[in-house]
Curated annotation (Swiss-Prot):
It comes from the Bacteria. This is Lipoprotein NlpI. Homodimer. It comes from Shigella boydii serotype 4 (strain Sb227). Residues 1-18 form the signal peptide. Gene3D superfamilies: Tetratricopeptide repeat domain (1.25.40.10). May be involved in cell division. May play a role in bacterial septation or regulation of cell wall degradation during cell division. Keywords: Cell cycle, Cell division, Cell membrane, Lipoprotein, Membrane, Palmitate, Repeat, Signal, TPR repeat. The gene is nlpI.
């Protein structure tokens, strides 16, 4: 009897596990993680050939190194990207876009003072480079300089009030100063916006207008292909992670930040700072670095 009972127990457990897994697959919204495309690989090979075989002017070489660095960055190859950016800057030290990328990497590494200097250099070289306000604002946010972060993120928001992610980052900064006032400002921004971009659904969730389930249903309905689904998931899981973190639920936040990273949308702000959030939550840096290079 004992072997028979043991077999029944195992069969029951497998059946229950199968039901559980089926239920999980039906309820979760998942995308195939983004992979390098053939076009990207061909472009990289062509860039390598040009850099190795052609006589380029300094300006041409610096620009090509920058463009290859951007492509490396989009593939999650940050060490190679940093190397190209550093080489480009050594040739042409007046490239604001290079300082911008280096500032982002310094922020991700937690080297906030150096990041501030990099973004200051961007704005000194090109005062109209508005994304430096976003990236410096994020660095100031993680560096604990909340009022300065608010100033930069407000400037970035004012440049395009119909971009929901500008409102979300401003809210995250203002939440640390006055949570009630921050939510009221977010509500005003939502009401004034044209609401055309999908990200306003995340704002609606933050305002309590819709449930998390409704948010995910809208996400799935809005995605036109796997790429847009992966991008929306990277964004949504990051801001859901920040939401749960604000409630003190670090376990849910950790899981959501990992999901944000899992889509391999390497050049999205949400992917970049999900890695930093995981680091701040005590995740192993070597594991995070390895996952980001895959």
């Amino acid at each position: 009897m004992k072997p028979f009972l043991r077999w029944c127990f195992v069969a029951t457990a497998l059946t229950l596990a199968g039901c559980s897994n089926t239920s999980w697959r039906k309820s979760e919204v998942l995308a195939v993680p983004l992979q390098p495309t053939l076009q990207q690989e061909v472009i990289l090979a062509r860039m390598e050939q040009i850099l190795a075989s052609r006589a380029l002017t300094d300006d041409e070489r610096a620009q090509l190194l920058y463009e290859r660095g951007v492509l490396y960055d989009s593939l999650g190859l940050r060490a190679l990207a940093r190397n190209d950016f550093s080489q480009a800057l050594a040739i042409r030290p007046d490239m604001p876009e290079v300082f911008n990328y280096l500032g982002i990497y310094l922020t991700q590494a937690g080297n906030f003072d150096a990041a501030y200097e990099a973004f200051d250099s961007v704005l000194e070289l090109d005062p109209t480079y508005n994304y430096a306000h976003l990236n410096r604002g994020i660095a100031l946010y993680y560096g604990g300089r909340d009022k300065l972060a608010q100033d930069d993120l407000l400037a970035f928001y004012q440049d395009d009030p119909n971009d929901p992610f500008r409102s979300l980052w401003l809210y995250l900064a203002e939440q640390k100063l006055d949570e009630k006032q921050a939510k009221e400002v977010l509500k005003q921004h939502f009401e004034k916006s044209d609401k055309e971009q999908w990200g306003w659904n995340i704002v609606e969730f933050y305002l309590g207008n819709i449930s998390e389930q409704t948010l995910m249903e809208r996400l799935k309905a809005d995605a036109t292909d796997n790429t847009s689904l992966a991008e929306h998931l990277s964004e949504t899981n990051f801001y859901l992670g920040k939401y749960y973190l604000s409630l003190g639920d670090s376990d849910s936040a950790t899981a959501l930040f990992k999901l944000a990273v899992a889509n391999n949308v390497h050049n999205f702000v949400e992917h970049r700072y999900a890695l930093l959030e995981l680091s701040l939550l005590g995740q192993d840096q070597d594991d995070l670095a390895e996952s980001d290079q895959q």
